[in-house]
Amino acid sequence: TILSKDDRSIEVDSFVPSTLVKSMPLFLKFLSLRTIAHWLLAFALTHPAIAQLNEETCAKLKDLGRFYDNPDGKGLQNAKLFLSYQHQVGHINGEDGQGQAFKDDFEEFRRFWMGLSGSFGSYWKFKAVSQLSNDRNNHPDRKGGSYRQWGHETFRAANLTFDADQFWDFASIDAMEMGYGRRTGRMADEWQRSSTMINCLERSSFSNKLWLYDQENGNPLAAWVKWKAGRNTFDTAIFSGTYDDYIGGWTDSKVYYASWLGDYSESSSYELHEYWLSYYKQEGSLTDERLAGGNDWAFSFVNRIGDGPWALHTTLAFGNNGDQTAANREGDFGGIVLMPMYWLMEKKLKLVGRYLYQQSAQSEGLKLNSRYIPLADSRDSSIDLNSGRGDEHHAFYLGLNYYFCGENLKLVNGLQYDDLRSAGANQYQGWTIGSSFRIWF
């Protein structure tokens, strides 16, 4: 039990087996020739004759963006171009709250980002990453139009950092960074790494709910200090809710953020053993531009353990939706995400699982990812998925990733089952399958 609702606890364990049993006919219906063909294509691309790339080729890919390196220089000391391209296809097959079956297909330029990073003056680093794509070809005309737009949309990162420890040589700490600009507010485990490094096709909707996203689903402006002492790393920051396509200002809400990372790997029997605590509190009114959809506060506990070919990442978090335009979207929420992973072929083929359970105190206190359930709802007026909103959500994910050149060139494939309810009534249940080609340097 995670939260109480109307003085009644919602039991998770009894729900899971019955949900899976009831979903089997829908799953069998889902396995059409078309979806099987998607999987066959994905596996064909991973055949050794096609997929094998030698270490020299992969090393060239990883270093492709490096174009300047002069560590002894007094001005610019190094610089690197960044590019990330991801193309994604998906298929959904499910039932709405009235039991009406539907299915839909999607194809998109998932991400196309370019950027520049480097260091100068011995103590300074800079980073800027521009989102250059806005692919809405899957959206209906009545929801803002169906189009593919190219050019600068927003910055995913744009910041300047100062190596304070190297400059002042603090005796009691190992490192200290001071920074200003646009950056990520890390909460759930899935947001501890870049989109180029995530293990699933999409981050879970619960991790996205905790994320400090701005009104254009980007990373906000912040000022921060981060330092490391022994096994402990601390991060304190103030984030601004004010949005701008470029840098922005400080005229709207403010979010106060703090986190602690404890790395116990050296003293543990596991190769990987980490704990992460993070918290934020937002101050702002309903009329302000706000982060994280207006969340008032959130607290997250992350544990990561791993040994040899396996790893288990866990996120447990709670929060409050803050003031919303509709009362049934306010109130407390909480959830848990378990992500086991196993290397079937070392550094080549990884099996990824994920279980998600989340619930909220109000009937529409949760919302699923736009890919692809709410999107399917907007495309088909004959079904009603309540725009992907509800108060209780289960999701089971199973993925298989093939790494041509480590994280720099890979194929990510995943199958997910979702069950969404609101006030005890079913809103959606069904399966989503997808595949994504991802390359970056």
Question: What are these model-predicted stretches?
Answer:
Residues 68-93, 101-244, 250-269, 336-363:
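Outer membrane beta-barrel
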Residues 53-58, 88-104, 127, 143-151, ...:
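Outer-membrane beta-barrel pore domains
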Residues 5, 206, 435-437:
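In a subset of proteins, long, contiguous C-terminal domains/tails are tracked
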Residues 17, 46, 50, 134, ...:
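Hydrophobic alpha-helical membrane context
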Residues 1-58:
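Cleavable N-terminal export/targeting peptides
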Residues 54-69:
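Short N-terminal segments immediately surrounding and downstream of signal-peptide cleavage
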Residues 2, 36-38, 43-50, 223, ...:
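Intrinsic disorder/low-complexity segments
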Residues 42-44, 179, 335, 414:
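Small side chains
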